[in-house]
Amino acid sequence: MLMSDVEKFGGDCGSSGGSGRPTLKLGTRASTLAKTPTSTGGRTFMTVEVRSRKRKASGASPAEGVGYGTSPYTSDDNRQGQISRSATCSLTAREQLSRINAIHTADSISAQKEAAKKLRDEEEVEVAPPEGESVIDEPDSVKEPAAAADAVADVATPVLGDIAPGAAGTRPGRGGHDDKGKRYSYQGAGGKIKEKEGGGGVKKAAASRASSKHIKLDIENALSGTEERYVLMASSRRRGGSKSDRRISRDVVIPDEIEVKALAAAMAEKVGDVLRVLSHMGVEARQNTAIGSDVASEVAERFSHRPKVVSKIQMERELSDISDSGLALEPRPPVVTVMGHVDHGKTSLLDVLRKSNVAEKEFRGITQHIGAYQIDVDGKKITFLDTPGHEAFSDMRARGTNVTDIVVLVVAADDGVMPQTVESINHVKTAGVSMVVAVNKIDRSDANVDKITNDLLQHGVVPEKLGGDVMIVPVSAKTGENLDKLKSSILLLAEMLELRAPVEGRAQGVVIESKIERNCGVVATVIVQRGTLRKGNVVVAGDGSYGKVRNMFDDSDNSVEEALPSMPVRVLGLDKVPKAGDVFLVMPSEKHARDLLEHRAGINLSRGRDSGRNDSVFTGPLFSMDRPEGVNMILKADVAGSLEAISRSVAQIEHEEVKFNILHKDIGDVTKSDILLAEAASAVVLAFNVKVDAQARDLVRQKDVDIRHHRVIYDLIDDVKGVVCGKLKPIIREVQVGLLVVREVFSSGKGGTVIGCYVSEGAVSRGALVKIYRNDAVTCEGKVKVLRRFKDDVKEVGHGLECGVLVEGAKDVAVGDVIKVLEVVEHARVVE
């Protein structure tokens, strides 16, 4: 209920007519306040005229516009009635001020209640929870401040005629109430109305200050329109409090294991709040601590969310799912991988098919990178992958079979089936792909195709002419013989396989090779398996690489706008170098890409904790005194595939006395940080097809770091074996170079024993190591201290001569003993 505004105070309260009556101005709403002496006990009293402009008190009729009051313009009859009524409400000036303040306070509180109610009603209409989310109330502990704020609105509205018994004794000018739960209005130093709210929201110091100071109530400001603005401001603050009373309930996806900060982000809660809840649960954790799904679910429930536990496999499937449903499948070119033993002519065969000269550009004619090309054959496209034939590149060959449709196994007609040929056959069987055998070099005079066929039969490769399903095509890369037949065989097999893939939709494929180029950054060679890869797509590759495709190039270095299924392209724009063999996906946005990588990083972290090891970088101590001789190495290569092959080859060079520690391996040139690490750990830097950058060259000369450059993997592996051999202790052997027979024994005056001997085999020299045997048992061992021929000192005595020798430590010597002259020989150890 809203109280009437005070319109005017005035009139005369006694029998005098109104002249000489002092008035007190109260502003536009309170016009006059008359003070006049009366005849009743000489007591001063005032009369108040209250007019209602917009609102009226409950129970008043519309005609009631004037309340108690007197006026000099009223008639004598009416004046007598007004005087009689004013007698009942005649108050002192102090009491009138107290009553006016009470009216103002009640009016403000009622206005606040109505404004707050109106705002709450508007919120209920405007605020609606999103789909799948519900709005719930805060716990009681959160509602307490809002309840304390609303306590002011619950104060009973005072009526005009109610005055506390002690009101008459109130200090003049003291406005407001003494109850801390009410709202105080007083005039500050600047003349503005300030409000203080009691309860928990008012500090004790402020309350003490308000009670100790003599605060005058400025009636003009208290009843002016500025109060309405304060009411609205208070209502606005209350509206903000009402929003905090509500919380959004979410569906929180929780994996098998999740970090605390990730859980807080999923619930849209503060990390500190989550940690406090965990502490109350008895779980000591930090923001990077991983907690189980059961604990995370309980935390989510305590925040009134709905936990949904999913496995890591299921979450991976949901994040990386690319649905092909509803997409049309269209024919795609076959992906053909050329495999075989080293130097059997794989790259030369591809050069003839592509009409290129890749083999001439390769150092010493050896393929050490996997290559991807696409050619046109009779209007149809074929994608070829060229894999290295060296045994160190077995992982590359395995990746080739995993992304291919057809394998062309190249076997040299003059060399036959070799170890890498057999390995390639096993890869084909494991992958379950179709195969065509190309018997190359049939132009050689010693070519024997029938022998090749029989050798293949021993490894389970049955040709068509013997009832199998493998086509064998004799070809010559040098003369071009039967190349058309080989192309036709590939196209026929591809037609039989009915290769199809969706062209529309998000792209997915495999990383074939990756490297860092000086002017381009990270470059990844990929093959699209489905969908269309376009410039500007956000791509995730493997577990830690993502980015937006800035540019794409085909195998002829032409920039392309899009890549269709089975098309190999070089992609620029990734932030890190992906691993060869990683699967790449096109994601809807960078946020989706980061979410997928964070999930995969969490899986890898869990696997690392379970296994307790990290294969990428050596994390053990650099120096230790209680371990075998170690060789610290830093590997730098031009592409990811070569780095992988080198790491695998080095790991296979094992010896019980020497341990390899790969401190760091990376793609790109040797940098300053590599040199500093090599110096600190006394490491050998193996640089494969890379250079030393400008900043590191001067540092190499200063630090004297051992850097070994190689362009062929054969040489690198042999060099590593040489490093191992240099760390191994040599084999020490004693070789017999002479044999002496004791014929006389003389006692020397110096306390030694002079032995008269006959050299029956070889020779004896001064300083030689000798062992004295008696009945095949060693009685003494030492070096020849003195060697004489008759009375002359000599350096050496040969076969068939007599001599006298003095052996260090020889005392027990008898005639007939045998003295063997030995030579210590060190043999370097060889690692196979």
Swiss-Prot record:
Compositionally skewed regions (Polar residues) per UniProt: 29-42, 71-87
Location of the region described as G3 in the Swiss-Prot/TrEMBL record: 386-389
A GO CC annotation given for this chain: cytoplasm
Annotated spans, G1: 340-347
Biased composition (Basic and acidic residues): 1-10
The tr-type G domain, residue ranges: 331-500
Primary site of residence: cytoplasm
Region described as G2: 365-369
Stretch list, region Disordered: 1-87, 120-148, 163-201
Ranges for region G4: 440-443
Family of the protein in this entry: Belongs to the TRAFAC class translation factor GTPase superfamily. Classic translation factor GTPase family. IF-2 subfamily.
Name this protein carries in UniProt: Translation initiation factor IF-2
Organism for this UniProt entry: Anaplasma marginale (strain St. Maries)
Gene responsible for this protein: infB
